[in-house]
């Protein structure tokens, strides 16, 4: 009998992501323990966030409450969405879109937070009326040190806000548009050809993301010294870490899955398994970020001193030190 030279291929490796009940039935003891622990971590993240919201409503000035809640909620929301995507594999596209849309809003809210920490628009303009913005910063123009500084005016501040706000608005619009195309069968995350809608929409979102991150970086570079006592540097680091983990890490895993580097494991195809791994990693990472964020934002919210007050205090301390030496 002749034997043909071929490789057996499980047809389930080309199938869509499994239904939730099928994914649950194939779990072994380790899988059940893993899913339980990850679910508890996601739930704990949301409980910590709820407790933080209660603290913010009691202790934080009214004009800062909503902004801080939006910013501190990014990690718990991503943890919960990742948990839902882990349990319901076919809902991954929607949970990822929800997380990405929330983060787009947080990009704008973090810019507003830095301005509010200084005292709001009027206080910021009064404090920095003779200063300039350094626009030769990442992610757009970090390699262009020759760019001139821009005077700080109400108009330049509005342009910075608009640069971040457009991402929050357009991300929501494009998410709704993608869902409409998906219902018509015209949108698929696995179709990365030039004829597919996903590659064009995601590329456009990438450009909008870079444009939106630029104003936040410009504002951070300007206020980081004034807000150093308010832990603005680690807060900004957490914001950047969420960006890297939710966008870059997820994109790398998805690319590896599309290329077949991540092996198929029925009932999960390569792509579905890549999404599952991404969700599980994000739950752990967002849980840790939630705990760190709670420590950073749980403080007494008092106005920062004016520059004149700081200089006066330094002068008094210097005079007192000179008298003591004499």
Curated annotation (Swiss-Prot):
PANTHER family attached to this UniProt entry: ORGANIC SOLUTE TRANSPORTER-RELATED
GO molecular function per UniProt: protein heterodimerization activity; protein homodimerization activity; transmembrane transporter activity
Membrane topology reported for the UniProt record: Multi-pass membrane protein
Family per similarity comment: Belongs to the OST-alpha family.
GO cellular component: endoplasmic reticulum membrane; membrane; plasma membrane; protein-containing complex
Domain of life, source organism: Eukaryota
Annotated keywords: Cell membrane, Endoplasmic reticulum, Glycoprotein, Lipid transport, Membrane, Transmembrane, Transmembrane helix, Transport
Spans within the Extracellular topological domain: 1-28, 89-99, 183-198, 259-275
Source organism per UniProt: Danio rerio (Zebrafish)
Lineage of origin: Eukaryota, Metazoa, Chordata, Craniata, Vertebrata
One of the protein's GO biological processes: bile acid and bile salt transport
Transmembrane segments: 29-49, 68-88, 100-120, 162-182, 199-219, 238-258, 276-296
All ranges on the Cytoplasmic side of the membrane: 50-67, 121-161, 220-237, 297-326
Sugar-bearing residue positions: 5, 184, 191, 259
Catalytic activity: taurocholate(out) = taurocholate(in); prostaglandin E2(out) = prostaglandin E2(in); estrone 3-sulfate(out) = estrone 3-sulfate(in); dehydroepiandrosterone 3-sulfate(out) = dehydroepiandrosterone 3-sulfate(in)
Name of the protein this chain belongs to: Organic solute transporter subunit alpha
